[in-house]
Amino acid sequence: MPADVPLTVEQRILEAATRLTPGGIPCAPSETALLHELRRATSARRAGVAVDMALAAGVVDLARLREAARGRRRLPAVASYAIERACAECRSPKESEMLQVWEGDLRFPRPLMNREVIDLSGRVIAVVDLVEDASGTYGEYKGAAHRSRDRQRRDEARAAALRDVGLEGFVIVAGDSERVWRQRMQSARSRASWLPAGERPWRLGRFVPAPPLAHPDEAVSDAMMLDHYRSLE
């Protein structure tokens, strides 16, 4: 191709493609594929989610992604935003959106995501979706998995344990508008204790990644066993 002819996005992907094993198919590097996908994002929020989820899945490396982005001309603003503020500790799209509202819309400092909360005896109380250690504020997104009676009971016990050690929380559920998100975040942060580090009856532990997905055969076996146990009740 003549040097003075601009490359299309598709041509750049093919140019960057690598070949797998002999006889394999051309395969673009994950970072190149993600950059191409970001050009299709309809909003900065969606672009941010795409990057965070690719990082959570382990299919891209953030340093390589940023290096690849520096070599691209006319990168869309939403793509630049998503790569600049990327977070590898969000375990779901809603967590990524929650983080973006917290630090992007409200301009609060970046919190930690999916961290253990530990009491002074060393017991792990919970792993919370979002937590700001300076203020003692945490946030949770509760989707459909939290609607069962047993799950709601566990959630209430967990929230009580977090209150007992002085953490102030907010909860976001499916259907809430981002205006409601902002109100709850601001309200919880204003109620928080803001205790100095040495006076907190809690501390933060390690980051907890998402558990691996079960093998399909194991999932089928688990479902069969649950049906069997239900039949015995």
Predicted features along the sequence, with ranges:
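Hydrophobic alpha-helical segments and helix pairs
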Residues: 2-63
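Surface segments flanking catalytic/ligand-binding clefts of nucleic-acid enzymes
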Residues: 55, 60-233
